[in-house]
Design a protein with these regions (language model features):
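Short gly/ser/thr-rich secondary-structure transition/capping motifs
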Residues: 2, 50-51, 167
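Short, conserved alpha-helix that lines the donor NDP-sugar binding/gating region
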Residues: 4-8
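Short, acidic/glycine-rich phosphate-metal binding loop used to engage nucleotide
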Residues: 1, 45-47, 108, 124
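Active-site nucleotide-sugar/metal-binding loop of Leloir-type enzymes
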Residues: 60-62, 110-115
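PLP-dependent aminotransferase-like
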Residues: 9-98, 105
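Short, solvent-exposed turn/loop segments enriched in Gly/Ser/Thr/Pro and often Arg
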Residues: 1, 75, 163
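Active-site region of PLP-dependent enzymes
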Residues: 101-107, 114-169
Length: 169
């Protein structure tokens, strides 16, 4: 949950913005959007995969829509090609909640890596668990920097990436 909350903040969601999300997932997907005073908009799911339906995403886009949050369910990745094409067409960001599909592939890409930010929960009731925690992945350096700030209360702990000089390691 905290990882998805950080992801929403990192992509720049602001109060009043809309984020399209699936209704078929843990409530945290929607509540992380509410944390930033944004509005979760539920799109329908594909009855074959239970993942977000790209056509329903398109039907729910408004002038306030800023992002799409997919949740990969039952070990299946969402249709990321169609979803990313919609996102590109409407200049939207994409977050992937991949807690229920770690290790899944979509067209030779690992689930969670085809979005602007991918999240993997490690909560005790997920497929991979450590009791608590999570993993976020992105190939965008600006998002990575923002994620580090959000997760650490805006404090930059390591600025030079020289981990050898840290006494606490």
């Amino acid at each position: 949950t905290s990882g998805l909350t950080a992801a929403i903040g990192a992509i720049g969601i602001e109060p009043g913005d809309e984020v399209i999300v699936t209704p078929w997932t843990m409530s945290a997907s929607a509540t992380t959007i509410l944390h930033w005073n944004a509005i979760p908009v539920f799109a329908d799911i594909d009855p074959q995969t239970y993942n977000l339906c790209p056509d329903s995403i398109r039907d729910n886009i408004t002038k306030y829509t800023k992002a799409i949050m997919v949740a990969d369910i039952f070990g299946l990745s969402a249709d990321m090609e169609k979803i990313n094409n919609i996102a590109k067409e409407f200049n939207l960001k994409v977050i992937s909640d991949t807690a229920q599909a770690p290790g899944a592939f979509y067209r030779n890409c690992m689930a969670g890596t085809m979005a602007d930010i991918g999240g993997f929960s490690l909560n005790y009731h997920k497929h991979i668990h450590t009791g608590e925690g999570g993993i976020l992945v992105t190939n965008n350096d600006d998002y990575a920097d923002r994620l580090r700030l959000i997760r650490n209360h805006a404090e930059v702990v390591v600025a030079d990436k020289d981990f050898g000089s840290l006494a606490n390691m």
